Amino acid sequence: MTKNQNFIETKEYKRFAEFCDACIKYQYIGICYGQPGVGKTLSSRYYTNWNTIEKQVNHRGWEDLASKTTDDILSVNKIFYTRPAEKQTRLSNDLYSISASIDLGQKLHIVNKYGHDHSKHYSDMFKYIDLIIVDEIDRLKVQHLEQLRAIYDEHNLAMIFIGMPGIEKKLSRYPQLYSRIGFAHEFDNLSKDETHHILEYKWQDLGFDLKLEDFTDYEAITTIIKITKGNFRLIHRLFAQIDRIMDINGLDKISTEVVETARDSLVIGIR
């Protein structure tokens, strides 16, 4: 699924959103873990509206920031952050920079669009931030975890760490941080019924109607479910190949042969 496509709120997403809401309510640190491709990052970005906000806070100075802001910036109370693999700077600097950009963007937008001074004093760093989601927590070193703990202790907010299964064991080695974790959530694969639901949307995206009474459609769906095993990312990668194969060959029907050819075109992720 690309950033421009509609997000489908699955049961797993709704469970994740409830988990995030609980962390905010109690101002806890939470950990969310799951296999690659189940939808952790996509769900986090959707929950924080980060696809919209990220474009506004990534700027080249205040004039650039002022030209990008929309009313969405005014309601920002969550931050989504992924630690770049190549950067060695302080993680806390990145988070403070994002928060400062949100703060400045809110001020500039109110002044420029509404012609009056900002109604709230966005001065205390993270004052209006309720939640920071940190993706790929597995990448972080001890000093980065300590920086996150310091931010959590200094500000009234919640944090959620996103990672692979087993991340809770890694974090347990750092008792000062681990003692602050209040909730844990496993992000699971899609159920068979939800995969069916997603596939209906994917059929429509390609301009086709899914008809389960049509054996060709039924057989294709069964094959896709068997291949992807409910893995969200794998479904979308497979359909990108299906779309390409059908376009090249001028086909108007998704068959098992098309699905298997698409599977063989994928570099990784199929066993």
From Swiss-Prot:
<protein>
    <recommendedName>
        <fullName>Potential ATP-binding protein</fullName>
    </recommendedName>
</protein>
<keyword id="KW-0067">ATP-binding</keyword>
<keyword id="KW-0814">Transposable element</keyword>
<keyword id="KW-0547">Nucleotide-binding</keyword>
<dbReference type="GO" id="GO:0016887">
    <property type="term" value="F:ATP hydrolysis activity"/>
</dbReference>
<feature type="binding site">
    <location>
        <begin position="34"/>
        <end position="41"/>
    </location>
    <ligand>
        <name>ATP</name>
    </ligand>
</feature>
<dbReference type="InterPro" id="IPR049945">
    <property type="entry name" value="AAA_22"/>
</dbReference>
<dbReference type="InterPro" id="IPR052026">
    <property type="entry name" value="ExeA_AAA_ATPase_DNA-bind"/>
</dbReference>
<dbReference type="InterPro" id="IPR027417">
    <property type="entry name" value="P-loop_NTPase"/>
</dbReference>
<dbReference type="Pfam" id="PF13401">
    <property type="entry name" value="AAA_22"/>
</dbReference>
<dbReference type="GO" id="GO:0005524">
    <property type="term" value="F:ATP binding"/>
</dbReference>
